[in-house]
Curated annotation (Swiss-Prot):
Reactions this protein catalyses: RNA(n) + a ribonucleoside 5'-triphosphate = RNA(n+1) + diphosphate
Taxonomic source organism: Lobularia maritima
EC numbers on record: 2.7.7.6
Keywords (A to Z) from UniProt: Chloroplast, DNA-directed RNA polymerase, Nucleotidyltransferase, Plastid, Transcription, Transferase
Pfam families to which the protein is assigned, alphabetical: RNA_pol_Rpb2_2 (PF04561), RNA_pol_Rpb2_3 (PF04565), RNA_pol_Rpb2_6 (PF00562), RNA_pol_Rpb2_7 (PF04560)
Name of the protein described by the UniProt record: DNA-directed RNA polymerase subunit beta
Purpose of the protein: DNA-dependent RNA polymerase catalyzes the transcription of DNA into RNA using the four ribonucleoside triphosphates as substrates.
Localisation: Plastid, Chloroplast
Subunit structure: In plastids the minimal PEP RNA polymerase catalytic core is composed of four subunits: alpha, beta, beta', and beta''. When a (nuclear-encoded) sigma factor is associated with the core the holoenzyme is formed, which can initiate transcription.
Top enzyme category: transferase
Sequence similarity: Belongs to the RNA polymerase beta chain family.
Disulfide links within the chain: none
GO biological process, one term: DNA-templated transcription
Length: 1072
């Protein structure tokens, strides 16, 4: 247990701290550990020895800046230098040099790495902790079978099981098992040592037959017996050194290496005191495990819960980077061995610098960041997304589970998750429960366990808080912990009452005097996403989960706005995301514009560059706007510029808009949403999106490709935006089909394509006439916009054959439109169904038209009542010009606290603004509103308010797609699937039934033949459309039916067709 040193106070830790601590642990400890494991390498004749001197390693500061690495597609990394020595044993001379081993990608201030110009982040993984676990299962006779499973550091498993006769077996494979005596003897123990080190020697002697004695008569016999069972080898193998090495490699290395965490866990579980540096399984461990298993058989001891967090460990970024460094150094060892051997064979004098190459380390890390499942591209949709991505916990990945094999018990919430893993925030779909999110205060301990903070209370008074303790999952089981809805913030309230508490994974109600620990904050069990939901205690957990996920999909708007109703975490999320520019020094502002801010302080001048229209990997716009004026004095930590989706240093993902909950002509049926045209014309929900288009130039066999403006056979209007070099000009407005970069690729024309004069020139002068085809970069469908940046990228120091890249960045301004998706913070999502003129929208008693109409039926069945509280409190806040920051579980102060707060604020707003309709006692929170089309009041009063509504990244411009004709699949001859492949619409079984129900036979036949997979009918339709005339009726079967016939034929089933008639049936009418 660790305290933070300050008594009775706590601060929310930095949200990126998990990533920073992991990388620091790798640089500070893991790097030295792996380098110190690098062995001394000798040649075959043992004359030359190569070794590394770890104490003098050095990491060099990168030469490029982060922003340049992104634009030039480079890796932001540090060069690793180590001193190496080459010793000649005969002359006892040593040559020492400082050598370059490779590049290690660095972590930036966002907790991410930049690899090949792409922001990447490493996800923390939850694995079964190495150690021993005892479980019980019922066999087919209903008898309990006890097993002990030893899990190695590599994830390998060795199972011990006890049968009806109390004999203990070690299962070495799915089908083969050997006696525990044979395994112990093969590991180096004799029978006398075995019997001396067990608690039940009589049980071990009971199954010691003469045959068994012969097997364990010597270590060699035991190893041979073990090898026969493990490798399933028949006959009598001969004992040899190679046989021992094979066993060592295939069995002992994979299943018996415990690591320091496994050694600690086994010592604790079996009450052993073996030193921590013994990281391999010993015979003493096997015998102690067998003793414990016998005790389980006779009812002593407790079984293990495999899903408890004390039996899990976190594989952080430090562990993953250290594993990759070990792998790279193993490859480097092989390279050095080969180079030394080659130098001696060719009688060359090697030097340390010639022996070592940087390729193994550099390529290992680049492949890790590029290919490893736990290394992901950073999601930069908005500031919240960036932070939450780095705090994910995954059961998936190498050594973990898969979405197909994980059972429900693993996915479910466990009591040990309390305060460590958020019970709400997880992914939806096949990975539900397998990808979680860290709670706000959780941290990773030294042994890979998740720790959560609690306040320790005085023994007598239980009134004051002494200090904050961080407890691991194995420690907090032994304490009575007051649950989160107890009074964690208010000391003045009487606490001598019964309180809900947690003890040994059970939730109890106990007297306050019995409480040992209490939680420190009401939302310490939630993740960041869930903690941003106001009134979350009034929502169903499924809807809170959807809200946590949808807030990460919110698009930064062109004019953001703070939420009226929040939880108080918005500021820290914005600051830790790195999106706003924050002053690192105090001083005076000398100059400010959209590109930079110049600050003078302590005699120095600092220039702070601002981000201007930078593209995120989700095509959203990252932009910083200065918030300070020239001549103003600022302090360290003050906000200089707001970023995307931040206002005044607070997270601002959406807008506070006027909403009514009422049906309107069926346009908000099934979660559809009706909006006013003012949201479009006033740019309320307008966002900017930046797309990147890229083209490369290569050197072909016919010559190099050329970037040029002179493109033959193309209309001039398509080339109107190109400059003299053939690249689109900055600031140009481009439409679909326009040329962004003109490029010609050389090719040799066929003889038949030459004109007569070309053939004459070739015959007389022998001139080879070359032609070129245009391979220009054209703007695809839906890409219209303004060109804001053009970059010509070529890697330095490369040959002329290196491809040049030209990148064009185009900005799009997107207003909200029909088909876009919007959502609140309570899982209330919907699609825009209609945009009404503002004069037709329902309006309030003060004449204001509402901006959005939601369906009231979306509330009771979804049980997300929090949106109603937020809606009404938002209205009161807008009238009183107040902002509210409400922590969850406010019912800990009194019953119905949320409802009382909302009603009191509405009442105050009604009095202050002299608008009695704001709070009407007959139906509080509701108001009578009027139909904009007729001016008549609606029959029932309606809930109106100002909730915080987000615009999500699922936009109709990215989804809508149409095609007349296009590509067809080769096998089925049906249209391809998806917008990216210019695919067609699928008419499945249910669609066919719907058309059959309406009796539209001809339309159905068109869809299943002409428009799908009837090859000849497709061609005839095209011909008749051009020439004119009637479309012929298809007579033969479509291609998919022919495919079915061929598949049946491959199964030796021939399908024939014939005309059905009475003659074929041979019906006997008299018999009928």
């Amino acid at each position: 247990m660790l305290g933070d040193g300050k008594e009775g106070t706590s601060t929310i830790p930095g949200f990126n701290q998990i990533q920073f601590e992991g990388f620091y642990r790798f640089i500070d400890q893991g790097l030295i550990e792996e380098l110190s494991k690098f062995p001394k390498i000798e040649d075959i004749d043992h004359e030359i020895e190569f070794q590394l001197f770890v104490e003098t390693y050095q990491l060099v500061e990168p030469l490029i800046k982060e922003r340049d690495a992104v634009y030039e597609s480079l890796t932001y990394s540090s060069e690793l230098y180590v001193s190496a020595g080459l010793i000649w044993k005969t002359s006892r001379n040593m040559q020492e040099q400082r050598i370059f081993i490779g590049n290690i990608p660095l972590m930036n201030s966002l907790g991410t790495s930049i690899v090949n110009g792409i922001y990447r982040i490493v996800i923390n993984q939850i694995l079964q902790s190495p150690g021993i676990y005892y479980q019980s299962e019922l066999d087919h006779n209903g008898i309990s079978v006890y097993t002990g499973t030893i899990i190695s550091d590599w994830g390998g498993r060795l199972e011990l099981e006890i049968d009806k006769k109390a004999r203990i077996w070690a299962r070495v494979s799915r089908k083969q098992k050997i006696s525990i005596l044979v395994l112990s003897s093969a590991m180096g123990s004799n029978l006398r040592e075995i019997l001396e080190n067990v608690c039940y020697p009589e049980i071990f002697l009971s199954f010691l037959t003469d045959k068994e004695k012969k097997k364990i008569g010597s270590k060699e016999n035991a190893i041979l017996e073990f090898y026969k069972q493990f490798s399933c080898v028949g006959g009598d193998p001969i004992f040899s050194e190679s046989l021992c090495k094979e066993l060592q490699k295939k069995f002992f290395h994979q299943r018996c290496e415990l690591g320091r965490i496994g050694r600690r866990n086994i010592n604790w579980r079996l009450n052993l005191n073996i030193p921590q540096n013994n990281i391999f399984l010993l015979p003493r461990d096997i015998l102690a495990a067998a003793d414990h298993l016998i005790g389980m058989k006779f009812g002593m001891g407790t079984l293990d819960d495999m899903n408890h967090l004390k039996n899990k460990r976190i594989r952080s970024v430090a562990d993953l980077l250290q594993d990759q460094l070990g792998l790279a150094l193993a490859r480097l060892e092989n390279v050095v061995k080969g180079t030394i051997g080659g130098a001696i064979r060719h009688k060359l004098i090697p030097t340390p610098q010639n022996l070592v190459t940087s390729t193994p380390l550099t390529t290992t890390y680049e492949s890790f960041f590029g290919l490893h499942p736990l290394s992901q591209v950073l999601d930069r949709t908005n500031p919240l997304t960036q932070i939450v991505h780095g705090r994910k916990l995954s059961y998936l990945g190498p050594g973990g589970l898969t979405g197909r094999t994980a059972n429900f018990r693993i996915r479910d919430i466990h009591p040990s998750h309390y305060g460590r893993i958020c019970p709400i925030d997880t992914s939806e779909g096949i990975n539900v429960g397998l990808i979680g999110s860290l709670s706000i205060h959780a941290r990773i301990g030294d042994w890979g366990s998740l720790e959560s903070p609690f306040y320790e209370l005085f023994e007598k008074s239980k009134k004051a808080r002494i200090r904050m303790l961080f407890l691991s999952p194995s420690q907090d089981e032994y304490y009575m912990i007051a649950a989160g809805n107890s009074l964690a913030l208010n000391r003045g309230i009487q606490e001598e009452q019964a309180v809900p508490a947690r003890y040994r994974q059970e939730f109890l109600t106990i007297a306050w005097e019995e409480v040992h620990l209490r939680s420190i904050l009401p939302f310490q069990y939630f993740s960041i996403g869930a903690s941003l939901i106001p009134f979350i205690e009034h929502n169903d957990a499924n809807r809170a989960l959807m809200s946590s996920n949808m807030q990460r999909q919110a698009v930064p708007l062109s004019r953001s706005e703070k939420c009226i109703v929040g939880t108080g975490l918005e500021r820290q999320v914005a600051l830790d995301s790195g999106v706003p520019a924050i002053a690192e020094h105090e001083g005076k502002i000398l100059y400010t514009d959209t590109e930079k801010i110049i600050l003078s302080g302590n005699g120095d001048t600092f220039s702070i560059p601002l981000i201007m229209y930078q593209r995120s990997n989700k095509n959203t716009c990252m932009h910083q706007k200065p918030q300070v004026r020239r001549g103003k004095y600022i302090k360290k930590g003050q906000i200089l510029a707001d970023g995307a989706a931040t206002v005044g240093g607070e997270l601002s993902l959406g807008k506070n808009i006027l909403v009514a909950y009422m049906p309107w002509e069926g346009y908000n049926f099934e979660d559809a949403v009706l909006i006013s045209e003012s949201l479009v014309y006033d740019d309320i929900y307008t966002s900017f999106h930046i797309r990147k288009y890229e083209i490369q130039t290569h050197v072909t066999t016919q010559g190099p490709e050329r970037i040029t403006k002179e493109i033959p056979h193309l209309e001039g209007r398509l080339l109107r935006n190109l400059d003299k070099n053939g690249i689109v000009m900055l600031g140009s407005w481009v439409e679909t089909g326009d040329i962004l970069v003109g490029k010609l690729t050389p090719q040799v024309a066929k003889e038949s394509s030459y004109a007569p004069e070309d053939r004459l020139l070739r015959a007389i002068l022998g001139i080879q006439v070359s032609t070129s085809k245009e391979t220009c970069l054209k703007l695809p469908i839906g890409g219209r916009g303004r060109v804001i940046d053009v970059r010509w990228v070529q890697k330095k120091g490369g040959s002329s054959y290196n491809p040049e890249k030209i990148r064009v960045y185009i900005s799009q301004k997107r207003e909200i439109k029909v088909g876009d998706k919007v959502a609140g913070r309570h899982g209330n999502k919907g699609i825009i169904s209609k945009i009404l003129p503002r004069q037709d929208m329902p309006y309030l008693q003060d004449g204001r038209p509402v901006d959005m109409v939601f369906n009231p039926l979306g509330v009771p069945s979804r049980m997300n009542v929090g949106q109603i509280f937020e809606c009404s409190l938002g209205l009161a806040g807008s009238l009183l010009d107040r902002h509210y920051r409400i922590a969850p579980f406010d019912e800990r102060y009194e019953q119905e606290a949320s409802r009382k707060l909302v009603f009191s604020e509405l009442y105050q707003a009604s009095k202050q603004t002299a608008n009695p309709w704001v709070f009407e006692p007959e139906y509080p929170g509701k108001s009578r509103i009027f139909d904009g089309r007729t001016g008549d009041p609606f029959e029932q009063p309606v809930i109106i308010g100002k909730p915080y509504i987000l615009k999500l990244i699922h936009q109709v411009d990215d989804k809508i797609h149409g095609r007349s004709s296009g590509h067809y699949a080769l096998v089925t001859q049906q249209p391809l699937r998806g917008r990216s492949k210019q695919g067609g619409q699928r008419v499945g079984e249910m669609e066919v039934w719907a058309l059959e129900g309406f009796g539209v036979a001809h339309i159905l036949q068109e869809m299943l033949t002409y428009k799908s997979d009837h090859i000849r009918a497709r061609q005839e339709v095209l011909a008749t459309t051009i020439i004119g005339g009637t479309i012929p009726k298809p007579e033969d079967a479509p291609e998919s039916f022919r495919l079915l016939v061929r598949e049946l034929r491959s199964l030796a089933l021939e399908l024939n067709h014939f005309l059905v008639s009475e003659k074929n049936f041979q019906i006997n009418r008299k018999a009928v």
